[in-house]
Amino acid sequence: MDKIAILTSGGDASGMNATIAYLTKYAIAKQLEVFYVKNGYYGLYHNHFITSKELDLTDFFFMGGTVIGSSRFKQFQDPSLRKQAVLNLKKRGINNLVVIGGDGSYMGAKALSELGLNCFCLPGTIDNDVNSSEFTIGFWTALEAIRVNVEAIYHTTKSHNRLAIIEVMGRDCSDLTIFGGLATNASFVVTSKNSLDLNGFEKAVRKVLQFQNYCVVLVSENIYGKNGLPSLEMVKEHFENNAIKCNLVSLGHTQRGFSPNSIELFQISLMAKHTIDLVVNNANSQVIGMKNNQAVNYDFNTAFNLPKADRTKLLNQVNTAII
């Protein structure tokens, strides 16, 4: 019986548990023996394995996070640690490793594949910054978390004629901010592609306030407080000092913790099935993603050289009020 191991790596994302469950379901149907690695590459190096018989995923399918744990293990860049990780797998007769994570996790998998291990990567990150997939596992649910939270903030913002500045996750990718702005009818959004200094920010807000008595702005994380721009706390203070009451909200890890929604689960099921089919057909290491609502696969080199999606039109659309 062929064997596979599954691990989750990097930041957690809604749908990781469902991905593990779908992979297990399709693998067992193909007579594969399934192992789980606890806590990502850290567990792979430290030999922390459990079998699918030791963990009932039924109760975790709809839960956010990852029941087998995840971690960021920078020491894995050490070649000797990677060799030990491969040895741990080989001792169990495991030749196929499925990695659920983002670009950093993919780099670890590519390094393992160069040691003769078959690695299959699925895009697990809320940031939607994996170029080999139109949408990543966790993105749609994080977007729903943004919609729910912003809707609640809208009510109090409108009631008190205020400005609300809402910081959104996404690391260096603006997709959650742009898609979130469109999904919530935000007044405008600020991303790395259109960052505003204090004067520019105030000008945009006052333009919105010319036709309504409130303003809701989504801002990507990792923009303010660096590269010569003020912190968001300073932005808030600036507006307060200029007679515009301002609420500053960071949505933080609420964007990671929701139960995966329907479109998330649908796409996960397609990618999981495609992954197991590749394993059964003895494919070499591959990166799996979504394109036009279908699961697709690429070799590592092709995947790493795919271009980023251009969001210029969407950014202009959401910022119609201030252009």
UniProtKB/Swiss-Prot annotation:
Pathway: Carbohydrate degradation; glycolysis; D-glyceraldehyde 3-phosphate and glycerone phosphate from D-glucose: step 3/4. GO terms for biological process: fructose 6-phosphate metabolic process. One of its GO terms (molecular function) is ATP binding. ATP binds at G11, R72, F73, G102, D103, G104, S105. The active site is at D127. Pfam families: PFK. SUPFAM superfamilies: Phosphofructokinase. InterPro entries: ATP_PFK (IPR022953), ATP_PFK_prok-type (IPR012003), Phosphofructokinase_dom (IPR000023), PKF_sf (IPR035966). It is an enzyme of class 2 (transferase). Keywords: ATP-binding, Cytoplasm, Glycolysis, Kinase, Magnesium, Metal-binding, Nucleotide-binding, Transferase. It is found in: Cytoplasm. It catalyses: beta-D-fructose 6-phosphate + ATP = beta-D-fructose 1,6-bisphosphate + ADP + H(+). Its cofactor is Mg(2+). Gene3D superfamilies: 3.40.50.450, Phosphofructokinase domain. It comes from the Bacteria. GO terms for cellular component: cytoplasm. Substrate binds at T125, I126, D127, R162, M169, G170, R171, E221, H253, T254, Q255, R256. Mg(2+) binds at D103. Its EC number is 2.7.1.11. Homotetramer. Belongs to the phosphofructokinase type A (PFKA) family. Catalyzes the phosphorylation of D-fructose 6-phosphate to fructose 1,6-bisphosphate by ATP, the first committing step of glycolysis. This is Probable ATP-dependent 6-phosphofructokinase.
